[in-house]
Amino acid sequence: VGGNDKISGGDFTATVDGQNITLGVTNNRGKIASTVDGLMMYYVKLPAGTNFTLTAKATVNSLAKNNQVSFGLMARDEMYVDTSISDPIGDYVAVGTRNQGAINCFGRKSGELYDGPAATVKYGAGDTVDLKLIGTADGFTLIYGDNETASTGFDYALTAIDSDYIYVGFYVARNANVTFSDIQLTTNGVFSASGSGLKAVWNKVKDLFPF
């Protein structure tokens, strides 16, 4: 994110309105880059090995034209809260894009960025995009809007650093403001939608990551 002095302040914002979550990053904070990442994430912690499906609609309120800007769904190996480090912050998979919409989903595998196929459909400010992330014992399936489903190469485990848990949720990086709505989470075949089940899950998330 640019150093410890860049973590706090008003450059990172998060609001919850009913079942909608709006995340925003301004002033060039955070990035998706070849050797290191900086991002804001609203997440829930799941036991490693949990089968899950997370879906949401992402409404892009604003999105800068920069190769390091990104937003979407993410599952990752480790979570660092209000922390600035110089090393890559664990492996992950992301239902999102980078390089100004050129990439259809990506991840970080063994510390290296891994890109899915080229995107054929790009999204920007004013657009709403359907996002879907599926995690099973065989790997991950990623769906970013009307682009082709990405799964090849996303079969690595997210347990190299934290072998007990994975961290699943929504993220934004570098000059993006996005509202996530119609959120649905399924774990081990037990459906939790906008009712009490999901509310309990995200209340737990709010305790882990207060605003």
Describe each region flagged by the PLM.
Residues 1-211:
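Extracellular glycan-recognition regions
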